[in-house]
């Protein structure tokens, strides 16, 4: 009489073990593209903020801020994004600065708008962040902008353009 319960017990046991195996494999899965995009976005935003802090502390500076000069403004242990670069130019009046900060969106081929979207989300919709598409700057919030991207910024990179002063 108890023998008719045995197949049910085995089936329930097998289903439970299968569910447990699937759960564990999901917990040990490698980072997804979304997680990688968020990580790259956080790295870029930290870099961009460090460049801006350097310029705020050195308002007459123009040129490219050396990586070694950014250490006081980077979070402890923060790594720089791949292909990170910056350029600080004087505004036409000379009273302000235009700060360009950029980085590769992925070490793979092609641009990844996921990094740009994640950076915009991380900064609460900061309109200074966009993606370089040829000579155009594309905001994840506002689309194609009238800003012509300088030739020194590589195509496909994430780009932040901030003006200080006038």
Model regions and ranges:
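N-terminal signal-anchor/signal peptide hydrophobic helix marking the start
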Residues: 1-12
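Alpha-helical structural elements
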Residues: 9, 68, 95-97, 132, ...
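Generic detector of short, locally flexible boundary/turn motifs and exposed helical patches
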Residues: 10-14, 29, 55, 60-64
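Aliphatic-rich helix starts adjacent to a transmembrane/signal segment
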Residues: 12-42
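N-terminal alpha-helical signal peptides/signal-anchor transmembrane segments
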Residues: 37-61
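Extracellular/periplasmic head regions of type IV pilus-like filament subunits
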Residues: 56-123
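Short, surface-exposed interaction loops/tails
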Residues: 106-166
């Amino acid at each position: 009489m108890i023998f008719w319960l045995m197949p049910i017990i085995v089936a329930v046991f097998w289903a439970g073990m299968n569910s447990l195996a699937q759960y564990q494999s999901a917990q040990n899965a490698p980072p997804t593209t979304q997680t990688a995009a968020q990580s790259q976005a956080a790295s870029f935003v930290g870099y961009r903020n460090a460049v801006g802090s350097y310029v705020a502390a050195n308002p007459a500076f123009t040129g490219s801020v050396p990586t070694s000069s950014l250490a006081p403004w980077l979070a402890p242990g923060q790594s720089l994004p791949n292909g990170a670069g910056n350029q600080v130019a004087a505004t036409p009046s000379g009273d302000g600065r235009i700060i360009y900060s950029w980085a590769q969106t992925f070490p793979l081929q092609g641009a990844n708008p996921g990094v740009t979207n994640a950076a915009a989300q991380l900064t609460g919709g900061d309109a200074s962040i966009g993606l370089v598409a040829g000579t155009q700057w594309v905001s994840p919030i506002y689309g194609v902008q009238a800003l012509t991207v300088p030739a020194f910024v590589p195509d496909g990179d994430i780009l932040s353009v901030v003006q200080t002063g006038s």
